[in-house]
Amino acid sequence: MKILVDENMPYARDLFSRLGEVTAVPGRPIAVAQLADADALMVRSVTKVNESLLAGKPIKFVGTATAGTDHVDEAWLKQAGIGFSAAPGCNAIAVVEYVFSSLLMLAERDGFSLHDRTVGIVGVGNVGRRLQARLEALGIKTLLCDPPRADRGDEGDFRSLDELVQHADILTFHTPLFKDGPYKTLHLADEKLIRSLKPGAILINACRGAVVDNTALLTCLNEGQKLSVVLDVWEGEPELNVELLTKVDIGTPHIAGYTLEGKARGTTQVFEAYSKFIGHEQHVALDTLLPAPEFGRITLHGPLDQPTLKRLVHLVYDVRRDDAPLRKVAGIPGEFDKLRKNYLERREWSSLYVICDDASAASLLCKLGFNAVHHPAR
């Protein structure tokens, strides 16, 4: 059994070698010749999986180690009788922590408290729900918009997008990309929406590039609209609008979900799905794969305020470490993908063991996802 895996899927070689012969290949582009005798294909979001790639090939199963699936023609796979699995929620924690790292940086730079801001969350799936929970644990007001879930009658106080635009100080997008249909998200943030944002608002896109109209956004910024912008995703990736990059406050190369834990979850989820597909079901404990974190433990004295939280968050991950490299190479062919391929190891907050002498600080840090314990001061 021959299994092709994206060369940038961590732990893929070791895991899938339990099931067959593994060949690691670049994800963009996949060499069609390598598909000629392969039984399974494991990809990331950079690989377009459709009829033109797989027609006439012996592939029986496709797995994507990503939460999003807009790069996969699922309807064609089903029609062709090819098994498929994604990894929903695998990088949700990573994206939430990216948003926090960005907001805490902007709050420190611009001198505001997040408690004084209302956060509008567009898309309340695996990422949006986790973001809502962590924000509300801190006492930060959230407004939720998710028309598909609202129409299904899912639990939640869902508002219209217009209401979020009117009342939110921070608007963050966490939707799939739907190019048409009743829940179209292509250019959901169009010129009209962008111009309608509150003065001084923060706009964040860490889902799919085309959810925000990049041309319209650049026009508004060039005209002097007072707006802070965080973009991890871009229309036309791996190409991006270099002028837009110079105008945004934080720009990164589609790495919001790139924690080691998130990548490992994606790989293990599709590994388990494929092992079940071929009748040799196996399960993998994530902690058996991950290395020891760089920081073993730290001690925190006193209550948890915003500056202290910012220091803890940035000790694990400071978004600026990914902003600067992109600005240096923007516009150079191949460099966007190179930044992603050679991405420095990044961990999640749970990797940081925090010993607190304040019980409320320990409790709150645990709610936020840190590995925190209370030890009273002696």
Swiss-Prot record:
- EC number(s): the record gives 1.1.1.290
Q: Which UniProt keywords apply?
A: Cytoplasm, NAD, Oxidoreductase, Pyridoxine biosynthesis
The keyword DNA repair appears for this protein: no
GO CC terms in record: cytosol
Active site per database record: 208, 237, 254
Family membership noted in the UniProt record = Belongs to the D-isomer specific 2-hydroxyacid dehydrogenase family. PdxB subfamily.
Q: What is this protein called?
A: Erythronate-4-phosphate dehydrogenase
